[in-house]
Structure formats: C-alpha cells, structure tokens
Amino acid sequence: MGKIIALANQKGDVGKTTTTINLGASLATLEKTVLVVDADPQANASSGLGVNLQEVETSLYECIINKTDVRDAIYTTDIDGLDIIPSHIDLVGAEIEMLNLPNREKIIQQLLEPVRNDYDYILIDCSPSLGLITVNSLTAADSVIIPVQCEYFALEGISKLLNTIKIIKQKLNPKLEIEGFLLTMYDSRLRLANQIYDEVKRHFQELVFKTVIQRNVKISEAPGHGLPVILYDADSAGAKNHLALAKEIINK
C-alpha cells in the first residue's frame, strides 16, 4: 500500500510546492512510483511538472465536488513513474461547496483509496491555509512534511499547524505522524540561517531531516521551464539535495 505524505505549512513561500515537485521527481528517479496531488488552488505544482492548465479537463476539483473518478484526473509527466492530479483555480470555492457534503473531512481520503495501491508514494501539496481542503489532505495522509524556511519568522505559525495536526490525529486520523521538519533555502554562509537551523533542531530534535535544501538558483529557475530541478540541472546542489531527501525518506 502506498504511503501518503502531505506537505503543509500555512506560512507561504517556505518551499512547500518546490519540495513536492522535486521530492516526487527524485523518488521517481529512484524507481519509486509517485502520484503528486496538487491541493493548492494556485496550481503551481501542476505547472511546475509541465501540466498545461488550459488543457486540463478533469482536476482535483471535479473529483471532490462532482465525484468524478479519480483515475480520470491522473495525468502523466515527463518523468517515468511520476503522475499528477492537477489543481484548478475553482478549488478556491470548493471549501464552501464541501460544507454540505457528507464526511466532508474525508473526501480526499476516500477518492485516493482506489489508486493507493498503484503507487509507492502519494505526495499532497497542501494549500497555504488551514482550511477544509488542508484538513482533508491531513486526514488522508499517513504523515506530514513541514518545510521551514531558513529566514526571519521561520517558526511563525508552526504552533498553529502542530495544534491542527494534533486535533486531526485525535478526531479524524489517529495514524497521522510528522514525517519530518525540512529546512529549506539554507545558506551556510549566513548567521541567521545557522541560528534558525540550530533553533529548529533544538525544538524538534530527531524530527528534523538530516538533509537540508540549500538556497540554489537552479531550483528557482526550473519551474519556469515546467521541469523539476533534477531534469533542469541534475548536477546542481538543488537536485542533489532533493535526491538525498528522497533517499532519507525511502530508508526511514
């Protein structure tokens, strides 16, 4: 049975979507089968994996609201073994439409169940909010990766996210665990980055991934080409960091 990992942090611009794209590509490069679920209405994971959003006929939105078969929403990517369920801007209004649906917190869990055995890993790119779709994503997940940006206010809002995870674990998904805190945009030359690294390690200890994602221009450039960094520049620090992260997750 495939492992479902949500990537969540309601603080924006922490590298959540970038990590989803590049971790998925790295796992696939290591011959794992991967499904990325883009649960963010901005659909950046979709475009970052080369999906032409204008040509998408069935997205996560249709699966949630219209009960469309999830298999109709799965698209292949340029990487063998890496598929995606794309997002759509309509997902912005989906939370209101979901309010009257039965078992509204478990819709994503239920729609992924038929394809769970088809993949080694399912990665859910959560919206940068703690709304109903993120609650759905965490309810569906076995574990959650929390990216933490090595910049000012890095830990801002994490206590709120951890409280949400605690509530979901108590009421909706007792198996939910923290896969790890992932330090992103790390620059060892900066005192601030090292201070944040030390602070996160002190707070969360063994829950912090050994791998850190260094600040790297290739990571920033790759989405503009609709490619994960491992295809854009396999020799870059960004590609090597995400490959190391994938290996760390596989070996857990």
Question: What are the language-model segments listed below?
Answer:
Residues 1-252:
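P-loop NTP-binding core
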